[in-house]
């Protein structure tokens, strides 16, 4: 089955970050579902009070498995649990107006371009999906994310991690998927 998440593009339209994501899911006896998710995350954020701007865009990938929790495994509806391992390697830019040096006077530039970073994380997944018509299915998933490892650039934490979300924000996330069983 191939699917797309519809929340990410909507999030990108109404906020300063979001993502495009597609998934490939294999059905093993209506019980186990190995999953590969590939996406492209973007952020273009500005803080009005500090005038600091943050920008990134990069691909990310997740791999994992779901399992059907229902007793009747062959039903048109599925209740599933699972996990994912996620990874992204990305660059980001931080720009800001110069800072006034209080000791020596004058302006000191502040910002960085092309700061390299990477992130590894795990996700616990719980969700439902249902057959809508023919091969078309729709469903949602709720995700709890936990960072495993990270490499931040020389200027500290990035504002947004493609595929993971905002740093320092909620560890909770979700998807709303439209899937085509092939």
Where do the model's predicted regions map?
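Extracellular loop and loop/strand-boundary signature of outer-membrane beta-barrel proteins
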Residues: 7-10, 47-54, 108-114, 161-166
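Gram-negative (and chloroplast) outer-membrane scaffold detector with strong preference
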Residues: 32, 37-105
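Outer-membrane beta-barrel proteins
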Residues: 10, 28-30, 66-72, 89, ...
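Outer-membrane beta-barrel "beta-signal"
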Residues: 62, 66, 168-182
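Transmembrane beta-strands of outer-membrane beta-barrel proteins
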Residues: 2-4, 34-36, 61, 77-83, ...
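Short sequence motifs at beta-strands and strand-loop junctions characteristic
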Residues: 14-16, 55-57, 112-121, 166-170
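Outer-membrane beta-barrel pore domains and translocons
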Residues: 5-9, 39-41, 68, 84-88, ...
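Short glycine/proline- and aromatic-enriched beta-strand/turn motifs that initiate or cap beta-hairpins
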Residues: 1-28, 177-182
